[in-house]
Amino acid sequence: MLHENKTPLTIVTGFLGSGKTTLLSNVLKDKSFAGTSVIINEYGQAGLDHRLIRRIEERTTLLSGGCVCCNRREDLVAELQDMLNAHQKGELPLDRVILETTGLADPAPILFSILTHPLLVHHFYIDMVIACLDAANGELHLQNNPESVKQIVAADRVIITKTDISSPEVVETLRQKIQLINPAAQISTAAHGQVGIDIFAAPIAPDIDRLQNLSATAGEHATNIHSMAIQFEKPLDWLAFGIWLSMLLQKHGESMFRVKGIVDVGELGPIVLNGVQHIIHPPQHLPDWRDYEERNSQIVFIMRDIQPQQILASLNAFQHLIGAEPEIKEICLDPFA
């Protein structure tokens, strides 16, 4: 298996006041998290959140005085190395690591630091990014704070928090906006910071049926973000597709916010594809298709300053160049135009 003998690392992000610490504090009380270590990054020098997670104080580390997405990444790497060393010496159980970012963090540089480090990549894998979005203030955060949008774009799962102080109509409107920003994300809700521990069951692939039913009506956002989901009816040549994707990210990596999907390469099971900006997670090979009703490739792209038609034209041109032209069923979601 791809992740055998590796420790999952979950990134929990979300804008300031979105309820990250409250949610973690409640979840970590479950006995199934007894072997979980937590790293909490706070922007200021005097940290507080780590003191709120008292249940696992001996396994909670504070990284303060800066954000791990920029000037504190070396501290994050050093802390993960220390955890690994302690675990190998038998001093620390390490079933999972959870990193809670600051409210101003962009998850992409954090992913880059972990996925490109020669030691960490052999001992840790990022199983998912969870983003919290405050139901009471989430719409304003998305409108006024680019960091909030980046957190949603990078997320595999988005949790709408504080639904206990928001109306169902507000929550539903926010859900629709999240779907339009990141069609690949799975969305949950939390009242009083309470969620099931199943939120840590990593999502694998986007729900194409849901994507097909989305209406692109949201969006009073004056932004240049576009999203698209495409479906291939025939197996893809994995080597050729990988070359095309690498070329695309090399040229447009900073503008390609998210690539996520499940790819049929003609084998017994699919390949799970997951990338943020120019960083692609190591592809995960699944043993079979038992969790999917249909056997086909489904891929979501979220990008800035790039029209969906440009991506499709580029892929079609490359497929034509190598003499492989699988049937493509495109779904263009362009809520921000």
Please tell me what each predicted stretch does.
Residues 144-146:
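Charged helix-capping and loop-helix junction motifs
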